[in-house]
Amino acid sequence: VLFLITDICSVYCRFCTRKHFTGQEQAFIRNDEYEKAIAYIKSHPGIREVILSGGDPLTVGDAQLDRVLGDLRAIEHVEIIRIGSRMPVVCPMRITDDLVKILKKHKPVFLMSHFNHPNEVTAEAAAGLEKLVDNGVPVMNQMVLLNGVNNHPALVQALNRRLLFLRVKPYYMFQCDPSQGTDHLRTSIEDSMEIQRELWGHLSGLAMPNLSVDIPDGGGKTYLVPNYETAREGNTRYYKGWDGVDAKYVSPAPEKIKKPELHHYLEEWNNLKSAKTPV
């Protein structure tokens, strides 16, 4: 679930998908709203991950952040906590020793950074990122493809290689959301997929982000993947690689496919699928 704990940001991005919500001077969620959110998470055991967002969660004070993380970590079924933040980009001095201690205390806490251009990976930003990962806080990056800003494979590969060198995993490469006033910043799906297609030929899997689009009206994320399959014949599939090389892949006959022993994992899986609350 997404837990919005503030509407304040350290910088207000022109392409923000929540511009209707941010900047309303609510530095921290009202206490009654906070208690209601915590109670909701407690009462829904299907919730395994909580994403702290806003606004930027790292604009709140250390004591408040410690309280939020502590309350979430006390909920037995919450396994992973994520924090989405632009602070490592625009205000890396926020990554203090005290902050790192708080994040480490409530592990596992993942920091989801938002670097969009290789020029944003400054020496100060690099120092903040290394302080996080050196202390066991995993960092993953979510970038947005922006027309006229970073919509070229040369820029995307430079960004992701620099981040990976700093032990930051490139995670998402988002299609810019159709927010009001952002048409001039949006790339076409075709152009975005062509960027991804070129990256696959020149980046390792570790450096490769997942191209994704947020479907409007609550449809959730959908991966955008170039289709390399050219034909099928029975158990044989034909592919054309990113470099234009044609190849075929022969699958085992269906009668040779065996189901593994599932034990208690099947019950866990069925519970996950039947949970009414998305995780």
Predicted feature locations:
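Non-heme iron-sulfur electron-transfer modules
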Residues: F28-Y34
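N-terminal pre-triad scaffold of radical SAM enzymes
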Residues: V1-T17
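Conserved AdoMet/S-adenosylmethionine-binding subsite of the radical SAM
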Residues: E35-E49, L58-L203
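Short, internal active-site loops enriched in acidic
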Residues: P57-L58, P88, D217-T222
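Iron-sulfur (Fe-S) cluster-binding segments and ferredoxin-like electron-carrier domains
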Residues: R18-F28
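Short glycine-rich or small-residue beta-strand-to-loop segments that form or flank ligand, phosphate
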Residues: L4, I51-S53
